[in-house]
Swiss-Prot record:
Belongs to the FrhG family. It catalyses: oxidized coenzyme F420-(gamma-L-Glu)(n) + H2 + H(+) = reduced coenzyme F420-(gamma-L-Glu)(n). It comes from Methanocaldococcus jannaschii (strain ATCC 43067 / DSM 2661 / JAL-1 / JCM 10045 / NBRC 100440). InterPro entries: 4Fe4S_Fe-S-bd (IPR017896), 4Fe4S_Fe_S_CS (IPR017900), Coenz_F420_hydrogenase_gsu (IPR017681), Hydrogenase_assoc-protein (IPR051349), NADH_UbQ_OxRdtase-like_20kDa (IPR006137), NiFe_Hase_small_N_sf (IPR037024). One of its GO terms (molecular function) is nickel cation binding. [4Fe-4S] cluster 1 binds at C178, C181, C184, C217. PANTHER family: COENZYME F420-REDUCING HYDROGENASE, GAMMA SUBUNIT, F420-NON-REDUCING HYDROGENASE VHU SUBUNIT G. [4Fe-4S] cluster 2 binds at C188, C207, C210, C213. PROSITE patterns: 4FE4S_FER_1, 4FE4S_FER_2. Its EC number is 1.12.98.1. Heterocomplex of the form (alpha(1)beta(1)gamma(1))(8). This is Coenzyme F420 hydrogenase subunit gamma. Residues 169-197, 198-228 form the 4Fe-4S ferredoxin-type domain.
Length: 230
């Protein structure tokens, strides 16, 4: 009998855009849902406790001033065999890194950290929101045990908030490895990367440190494969 993979979707401090991105896969979503058992997703059904699961997709950053948020993050790590940071907020901090507090009569500065800095995360899918193809690709690779495909996402999970457009500059452009394909610019959700003379230029004031560009860059994602082709 084939074991059904149990998957949980956990939402922390986020806008739910990552889950919407997953829904945008349309017919592919049906293939994914037919391959798994969705055991937890408060956006779709009310549930009090996170059950034990094989894969936990965690969306959103962790509010360090909210004990509940911290407890949920720790509970996910205990209950899930594989924890996936879904989207920029969970993977690198994203736009929540720029939070300056609310608009109450006594403004309080709320501190947010990516999930990768609070608990041990196995995989991180960047992007704000992550592309539907990336989400389905990671879930499918995890179901099939394709570690080669998952390697860039595992590395991003270890880097945490360090991921940003500077990765492309330091790791690729400055080492004369850039092919000028423009994949990094196409992957950027805020248009913080522009191509000048066939090379990417990062506009730091627009970069939200989502990590999408570095994971999509073929030089970073498939370095050995590119070397073989050349």
């Amino acid at each position: 009998m084939i074991k059904v993979v149990k998957v949980a979707h956990v939402q922390l401090c986020s806008c739910c855009g990552c889950l919407v991105s997953l829904a945008d896969t349309y017919e592919k979503l049906l293939d994914v849902l037919n391959s798994i058992e969705l055991v937890y997703c408060q956006t779709l059904a009310d549930a009090r406790e996170i059950p034990e699961c094989d894969i936990a997709l965690v969306e959103g950053s962790v509010c360090l001033d909210d004990h509940h948020s911290l407890e949920v993050a720790q509970e996910v790590r205990k209950k899930a065999k594989i924890v996936v940071a879904l989207g920029a907020c969970a993977a690198t901090g994203g736009v929540t890194r720029y939070c300056k507090g609310n608009q109450l009569s006594k403004p309080v500065h709320s501190s947010f950290s990516p999930l990768t800095e609070v608990i041990k995360v196995d995989l991180a899918i960047p992007g704000c929101p992550p592309s539907p193809e990336a989400i389905v690709g990671v879930i499918t690779a995890a179901l099939n045990g394709d570690m080669e495909y998952l390697q860039p996402y595992a590395e991003l999970a270890e880097k945490g908030s360090e991921a940003c457009g500077c990765d492309v500059i330091y790791k690729v452009v400055n080492k004369s490895l850039c092919m000028g394909c423009g994949t990094c610019a196409a992957a950027c959700p805020t248009r913080a990367i522009e191509m000048l003379d066939g090379r990417p230029n990062v506009l730091k004031e627009l970069c939200i440190k989502c990590g999408a560009c570095s994971v999509q860059c073929p030089r970073i994602r498939f370095p050995e494969l590119i070397e073989k082709i050349e």
